[in-house]
């Protein structure tokens, strides 16, 4: 992105405050463009009226991310990679979380192939209010047989996940494309030997393609430039992923050099980068658990340092879960704390005799409290107070959590302790104990201070509920 101020974007907008974009003013819409929560296409006059055509083209150019965004697959499950503007998250944020594709082989028996693909599609982990999922399937042409590869692609495509076609044989890639023309797969890969044929396939079928040159950044840049000049825009870079020793160090350095050059304005290499942690299985490690461990280490390194897409092998939870959790953490937007909607939530089927708790709407706090309560079979009411996504202790200290805020949260939820319960009692977090007196005055209720840690709620309830 070449501009970072709403004022700079504003001068390219119609400046009529028509409201067709859903914002009251063009300046408000400009702010959405800068934080990438809005698109130029959301402004109908800018798109439809010819007099704004030049402004639209220039604004699109200025708003384009430094690293090109590439889409793999189609529909709701399509995987977007790249699209970043900064080297360090705290300067803005990272966009498009690292995508994790898991391998299958066209040599697998049909039942085993379908079982593994379904396992990839069904793998999920509930984490801080959302389900973490795997992103796609990388189909390896181990047989080097076009017909066999096409048959495997056809089976995998039925599941609906984005796909990577893995072969250096253009005939094999073409066979896969013929049975998945409308699936927008990523081709892996074009190298110094097959670049012309693979490039022609990418142009003919309008699909993204990986350019692969191991440990030679000049060669990689040259090949990417050749493809771009031929009209291929959706390019992914593979500088090689060595699994150990000096090779791994060189790989790490190459990723840094590529991303730094792209962010600093070298458009010839400003593309998403592919990492291949599954090379850990080629490092001579005989024990599968140890190989999975090392694959996870490599995946972690390149999640933190600019790997936009990865091909992995191990689907064991002890390998996949750390990879998924790390990616989710690194790609959390630091500008906006992860939060849940404020309001009154039911844990189980509470009635008028059930206890009433409150916590803040910081997602990690809320789901920890909710989990500790529900896992121990406690039926209750749980109020999430909107503190702008800040945890209890920090919100009390910063003034985001006050007795007035709690009262307002009860009113917005339409919940009255006097009429909706038989006990008129509120249990508050131990870290907000200083609010007890104010809350009793503000709510006209009996306020009890709960434990400092939600894990102790079951023991506290056993000793202190119902109130005497």
Curated annotation (Swiss-Prot):
Entry EC no(s): 2.1.1.245
Cofactor binding note of this UniProt entry: Binds 1 [4Fe-4S] cluster.
A single GO BP: acetyl-CoA catabolic process
Gene3D superfamilies: 3.40.50.11600, Dihydropteroate synthase-like
Transmembrane domains' residue ranges: none
Pathway connected to this protein: One-carbon metabolism; methanogenesis from acetate
Cofactor(s) in the UniProt record: corrinoid; [4Fe-4S] cluster
GO function terms (MF aspect): 4 iron, 4 sulfur cluster binding; anaerobic carbon-monoxide dehydrogenase activity; iron ion binding; methyltransferase activity
Superkingdom as given in the UniProt entry: Archaea
Classification via HAMAP family: CdhE
Protein name: Acetyl-CoA decarbonylase/synthase complex subunit gamma 1
Organism: Methanosarcina thermophila
Gene this chain is encoded by: cdhE1
